[in-house]
Amino acid sequence: MEQYYMVIDVAKCQDCNNCFMGCMDEHELNEWPGYTASMQRGHRWMNIERRERGTYPRNDINYRPTPCMHCENAPCVAKGNGAVYQREDGIVLIDPEKAKGKKELLDTCPYGVMYWNEEENVAQKCTMCAHLLDDESWAPKMPRCAHNCGSFVYEFLKTTPEAMAKKVEEEGLEVIKPELGTKPRVYYKNLYRFEKNYVTAGILVQGDCFEGAKVVLKSGGKEVASAETNFFGEFKFDALDNGEYTVEIDADGKSYSDTVVIDDKSVDLGFIKL
């Protein structure tokens, strides 16, 4: 049976918050009977998380839109005592009546994407705009967040689990916290920009930026990546796990080697003068 999935490209998000505004416009002051009560002001069912990596001038800033993951093995469903359920199309919904007064539901979500509505006395979260998807007159056939995005961050699709598994493998898609085994239906492209780190530097030879220097990155004595410096004499090895690495540089016969440690932070070696 076909189910709904979402793919979010971290590399394309510019933190414009159009997705958040679309979500708020759809749900704040709007009650959708059978789906959800109105959203409380200030809640972020589509939350844009931010992370800056590295140091100026070779730093970067990345943004990760984070809705409900609509997990196949959803802890909120398993522990919700009927207040949270999963539809056949994969969408996970909180029953707006059965969830009243059950603030403990928030503790069942390992992703922290559930909110407590003080005004309605009920737990709430992203519904994937199920009320729109169920409406045949809704021509876009996608949630408001995806429809509002002008940067093509979101890909929304309805397909079989088998077809989605093939897409995940072919495109190298990832999920948040895979170790939990919740099997989210929200996947990410370029998630490394938010979860992993890089090592970078600039190479100067006789005071000038050196283009074309050979740079090798090793871990445990084995080469894991290689690159050449660009016009500005810079190189960058990204998507690195925590650990110790060796950077070896050959700039027209001039050599350099250094050991760097990635420990939840990107490393900029500055300008290396050869």
From Swiss-Prot:
<feature type="binding site">
    <location>
        <position position="129"/>
    </location>
    <ligand>
        <name>[4Fe-4S] cluster 2</name>
    </ligand>
</feature>
<feature type="binding site">
    <location>
        <position position="149"/>
    </location>
    <ligand>
        <name>[4Fe-4S] cluster 1</name>
    </ligand>
</feature>
<feature type="binding site">
    <location>
        <position position="19"/>
    </location>
    <ligand>
        <name>[4Fe-4S] cluster 1</name>
    </ligand>
</feature>
<keyword id="KW-0560">Oxidoreductase</keyword>
<dbReference type="InterPro" id="IPR050954">
    <property type="entry name" value="ET_IronSulfur_Cluster-Binding"/>
</dbReference>
<dbReference type="Pfam" id="PF13247">
    <property type="entry name" value="Fer4_11"/>
</dbReference>
<feature type="binding site">
    <location>
        <position position="109"/>
    </location>
    <ligand>
        <name>[4Fe-4S] cluster 3</name>
    </ligand>
</feature>
<feature type="binding site">
    <location>
        <position position="68"/>
    </location>
    <ligand>
        <name>[4Fe-4S] cluster 3</name>
    </ligand>
</feature>
<keyword id="KW-0004">4Fe-4S</keyword>
<dbReference type="GO" id="GO:0051539">
    <property type="term" value="F:4 iron, 4 sulfur cluster binding"/>
</dbReference>
<feature type="binding site">
    <location>
        <position position="145"/>
    </location>
    <ligand>
        <name>[4Fe-4S] cluster 2</name>
    </ligand>
</feature>
<dbReference type="GO" id="GO:0046872">
    <property type="term" value="F:metal ion binding"/>
</dbReference>
<keyword id="KW-0479">Metal-binding</keyword>
<feature type="binding site">
    <location>
        <position position="76"/>
    </location>
    <ligand>
        <name>[4Fe-4S] cluster 3</name>
    </ligand>
</feature>
<comment type="function">
    <text>Isomerization of pyrogallol to phloroglucin.</text>
</comment>
<feature type="binding site">
    <location>
        <position position="13"/>
    </location>
    <ligand>
        <name>[4Fe-4S] cluster 1</name>
    </ligand>
</feature>
<feature type="binding site">
    <location>
        <position position="23"/>
    </location>
    <ligand>
        <name>[4Fe-4S] cluster 2</name>
    </ligand>
</feature>
<comment type="subunit">
    <text>Heterodimer of a large and a small subunit.</text>
</comment>
<feature type="binding site">
    <location>
        <position position="16"/>
    </location>
    <ligand>
        <name>[4Fe-4S] cluster 1</name>
    </ligand>
</feature>
<dbReference type="InterPro" id="IPR017896">
    <property type="entry name" value="4Fe4S_Fe-S-bd"/>
</dbReference>
<keyword id="KW-0408">Iron</keyword>
<protein>
    <recommendedName>
        <fullName>Pyrogallol hydroxytransferase small subunit</fullName>
        <ecNumber>1.97.1.2</ecNumber>
    </recommendedName>
</protein>
<feature type="binding site">
    <location>
        <position position="126"/>
    </location>
    <ligand>
        <name>[4Fe-4S] cluster 2</name>
    </ligand>
</feature>
<keyword id="KW-0411">Iron-sulfur</keyword>
<feature type="binding site">
    <location>
        <position position="71"/>
    </location>
    <ligand>
        <name>[4Fe-4S] cluster 3</name>
    </ligand>
</feature>
<dbReference type="InterPro" id="IPR013783">
    <property type="entry name" value="Ig-like_fold"/>
</dbReference>
<dbReference type="GO" id="GO:0018706">
    <property type="term" value="F:pyrogallol hydroxytransferase activity"/>
</dbReference>
